[in-house]
Amino acid sequence: MSNTVALYIVATPIGNLEDLSPRAARILAEVGLIAAEDTRTSRKLLTHYGIATPMTALHEHNEREQLPKLLEHLRQGKSIALISDAGTPLVSDPGFHLVRAAHEAGIAVVPVPGPCAAIAALSAAGLPSDRFAFEGFPPAKTVARRRFFRERAADPRTLIFYESPHRIVDSLADMAAEFGAVREAVVARELTKMFETVRAAALGELADWIARAETPRQGEFVVLVRGAPERAGAPAAADAERILQLLLAELPVSRAVELAARITGVPKNTLYKQALARKPD
């Protein structure tokens, strides 16, 4: 590490502890303080590498409160390493306010590259990677999430999302509805771990696979969706909803859903939710 005081943005393993780079390990051992998203989680990594550098918690709930103390630490000539629980800091993790404040204070901000779940999944997905957009976590609420996907359905770039295990089933069903059940996609989970899975299929198939999966849904998922063809018009989901609405006007819900699923390829459970919300009185 140079003698220049700096805020180091250090990427840490997303599962396999061997993925910490020698440079990252050295910097974590040499800085005066480590700002960690969760000190309990990061302690396991530091203990594994025999690193005894003091830590302080920096997460979304205390980042603004911690800024004065951390900036003062840097002004005193003591470098800080920022780490998240796993992967590259600031990629759907805290740290933005600290990095911005360091720049404004004239303090060097130095990236120490390494693991990132989004990029690892993209590299193994087999989807176009010359243009892509990282969209982070979709909204938790169904209506907002559907709108979130709908607004991105015509984007020609490969889209990368993170999702939690308790929302992955609903999110994939909503993606299939808004992007179209036949849109190419990839689900990646447990990356670099023993039960690593990278599965490529149509969105409708992935939604059904996850819903039927017998293995526990643990850890965060990365979902990658192929971009819409440049010539694409309105999202396929809009056609599916129109077809469903026409059928609901003439048929019972169960029959309308069955026919709409056969016509559009959208999963029945997704169409059934729409039917309950939209069936005319």
Give the predicted meaning of each segment.
Residues 57-64, 138-141:
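Conserved helicase motor
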Residues 1-60:
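Glycine-rich, flexible N-terminal cofactor/catalytic loop recognition
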Residues 4, 158, 165-281:
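A contiguous loop/helix-start segment that scaffolds small-molecule binding in enzyme catalytic cores
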Residues 97-155:
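Class I SAM-dependent methyltransferase SAM-binding "motif I" and its flanking Rossmann-like core
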Residues 5-7, 77-81, 157-158:
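Loop/turn-to-beta-strand initiation segments
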Residues 36, 111-114, 161, 187:
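General beta-strand structural signal in soluble alpha/beta enzymes
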Residues 75-120, 166-170:
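A glycine-rich beta-strand to alpha-helix segment
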Residues 27-34, 106-110, 158-159:
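Short active-site oxyanion
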